[in-house]
Regions:
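An amphipathic, aromatic/His-enriched active-site/gating alpha helix that lines ligand/cofactor pockets
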Residues: 24-36, 56-90
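Intrinsically disordered, low-complexity segments enriched in polar/charged residues with Gly/Pro
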Residues: 15-16, 27-30, 41-44, 77
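Short, well-ordered beta-strand segments in beta-rich or mixed alpha/beta enzyme
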Residues: 2-9, 39-68, 93
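Short, surface-exposed ligand-recognition loops at beta-strand->loop->(often short) alpha-helix junctions
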Residues: 9-22
Length: 94
């Protein structure tokens, strides 16, 4: 199993709307992807515009090729992308 960790910074004052958007995007879009196994979102206390998203995949390729290279990625970014203050920083772990 592969763990994707994405550090996300959103525009100030958008937390409530982003909370709804990320939940909707994960449950309606990302969860449809091949190899998707689950997710967890952590919100910053000292930095309320900072989120850490954990997504579990069967393989690295399920995320980097299947999801990111397919139509679901565009749907996901259409939902959450407008909130980003900067591009997310994404890394993978075993």
């Amino acid at each position: 199993m592969i763990l994707e960790i994405a550090e996300i910074r959103i525009a100030p004052g958008q937390q409530a709307a982003f909370d709804e958007a990320i939940q909707r995007g994960l449950t309606t879009v990302v969860s449809q992807a091949k190899g998707f196994r689950g997710w967890k979102v952590n919100k910053g206390i000292e930095s309320p515009e900072r989120y850490v998203l954990h997504i579990f995949w069967d393989t690295l390729e399920d995320h980097t090729v299947g999801f990111r290279g397919g139509p679901l990625f565009a749907q996901w970014r259409a939902i959450v992308g407008p909130f980003f203050a900067a591009p997310p920083v994404v890394e993978h772990f075993t």
